[in-house]
């Protein structure tokens, strides 16, 4: 291999990496939009009966003024973000105290509740909507089995990666759909507040998510979390095999078992080629099943990063709030949905490019959410007026 060759960057395969992460994100958003269009075409009726911690400080009413709605939505967002911050710091404390088994049990129980409770509610609504004949006992048995399998698929690595990815996307769909039932003003202010929180939690030195990641790196442990990991990009070539090459600088002062790892890169190594110099090259398959050898083997709760296998990891919270944005837009019209979807995809692409430059965990919400919110209001205030005027004057129809 040519030693002067530039190390392979994620920019060289940005197209495949984008598809690997944009496909599940798009499926999640499309499913939420579909559920919104089927189940609650009238947002006012569904919002009034739905309450959660996101509406603890203020309950929006149609008779309230716009200023009152904004202030109330701001209070709701502060309460919600504060609750998330406290919960995340509790998670940091438990991880610091090495209560990993308890965290895994808690995450598994949470996944079971989401699949069983929220999933059951949505399935009941769909059954009622389409008049599907099924008895309650059969429904409960199927729902229980589906939820149990989902918990094991998400938190046990022996399952197929496609099954795990499918369950993660479905969990994101369930949570996102119920977030779309929040009042309109609360939804938009909450999305902006969560984007700002994501920046602080991931990038600030005292951010809870950054503390978790640094602690996991220092201990060489995984954080129990709901994280979507895309498959790594593997290129097939008739003459070469893609490998991860660990270059070790052998030192005469140390024995062979304590070599210092200098560079970790993906390269195409000829199968016949065997290096013979002071710098030894050990090639291993690109999909490495030994996470303890990787420097970036941590699991991110939110944000975007690179896993030990070279695959991109995206927190399930990002799936959820992307889908909340387009789901809320679907309550207005589909033209706004298209605009918000393109804005989110563009923001995610920008975030992936930043990831390729900085090579560390980055918040995935800010760029996409900000672009999505801006495009939503531009579509409602400008694009709709333009399209209506063009249609009424037969310029387009």
From Swiss-Prot:
A single GO molecular function term of this UniProt record: aspartic endopeptidase activity, intramembrane cleaving
Residue ranges annotated as Cytoplasmic topological domain: 1-17, 98-106, 157-158, 210-305, 358-366, 388-397
Entry membrane topology: Multi-pass membrane protein
Keywords assigned by UniProt, alphabetized: Endoplasmic reticulum, Golgi apparatus, Membrane, Notch signaling pathway, Transmembrane, Transmembrane helix
Intramembrane region spans per record: 367-387
Topology Lumenal: residue spans: 39-76, 128-135, 180-188, 327-336
InterPro entries linked to this entry: Peptidase_A22A, Preselin/SPP, Presenilin_C
An example Gene Ontology CC term for this record: Golgi membrane
Any one biological process term the GO annotation gives: Notch signaling pathway
Chief localization: endoplasmic reticulum
Short motif PAL, span: 363-365
Localization terms from the record: Endoplasmic reticulum membrane; Golgi apparatus membrane
Residues that span the membrane, as ranges: 18-38, 77-97, 107-127, 136-156, 159-179, 189-209, 306-326, 337-357
Location of the active site: 198, 318
Purpose: Probable subunit of the gamma-secretase complex, an endoprotease complex that catalyzes the intramembrane cleavage of integral membrane proteins such as Notch receptors.
Protein family per UniProt: Belongs to the peptidase A22A family.
Subunit structure comment from the entry: Homodimer. Probable component of the gamma-secretase complex, a complex composed of a presenilin homodimer, nicastrin, APH1 and PEN2.
UniProt domain comment: The PAL motif is required for normal active site conformation.
Protein name (Swiss-Prot/TrEMBL): Presenilin-like protein At2g29900
């Amino acid at each position: 291999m040519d030693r002067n060759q530039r190390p392979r960057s994620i920019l060289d395969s940005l197209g495949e990496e984008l598809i690997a992460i944009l496909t599940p994100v798009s499926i999640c958003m499309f499913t939420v939009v579909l559920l919104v269009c089927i189940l609650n075409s009238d947002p006012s009726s569904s919002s009034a009966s739905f309450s959660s911690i996101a509406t603890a400080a203020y309950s929006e009413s149609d008779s309230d003024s716009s200023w009152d709605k904004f202030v109330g939505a701001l209070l709701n967002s502060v309460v919600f973000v504060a609750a998330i911050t406290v919960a995340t710091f509790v998670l940091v404390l438990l991880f610091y105290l090495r209560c990993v088994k308890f965290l895994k049990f808690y995450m598994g129980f949470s996944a079971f509740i989401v699949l069983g409770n929220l999933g059951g509610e949505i399935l009941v609504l769909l059954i009622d909507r389409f008049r599907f004949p099924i008895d309650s006992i059969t429904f409960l048995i199927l729902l229980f089995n589906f939820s149990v399998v989902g918990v094991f698929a998400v938190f046990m690595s022996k399952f197929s990666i496609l099954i795990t990815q499918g369950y993660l996307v479905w969990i994101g769909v369930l949570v996102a759909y119920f977030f779309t039932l929040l009042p309109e003003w609360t939804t938009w202010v909450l999305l902006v507040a969560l984007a700002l929180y994501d920046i602080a939690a991931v990038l600030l030195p005292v951010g809870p998510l950054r503390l978790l990641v640094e602690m996991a790196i220092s201990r060489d442990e995984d954080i129990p979390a709901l994280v979507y990991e895309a498959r790594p990009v593997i290129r097939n070539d008739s003459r070469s095999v893609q490998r991860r090459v660990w270059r070790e600088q052998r030192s005469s002062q140390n024995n062979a078992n304590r070599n210092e790892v200098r560079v970790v890169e993906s390269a195409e190594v000829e199968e016949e080629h065997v290096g013979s110099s002071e710098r030894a090259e050990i090639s291993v398959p690109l999909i490495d099943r030994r996470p303890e050898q990787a420097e970036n083997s941590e699991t991110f709760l939110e944000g975007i990063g690179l896993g030990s296998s070279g695959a991109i990891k995206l927190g399930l919270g990002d799936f959820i709030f992307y889908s909340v944005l387009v789901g809320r837009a679907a309550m207005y019209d589909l033209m706004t949905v298209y605009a918000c979807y393109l804005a989110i995809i563009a923001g995610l692409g920008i975030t992936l490019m930043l990831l390729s430059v900085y090579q560390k965990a980055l918040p995935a919400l800010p760029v996409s959410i900000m672009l999505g919110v801006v495009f939503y209001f531009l579509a409602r205030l400008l694009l709709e007026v333009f399209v209506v005027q063009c249609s009424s004057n037969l310029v387009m129809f």
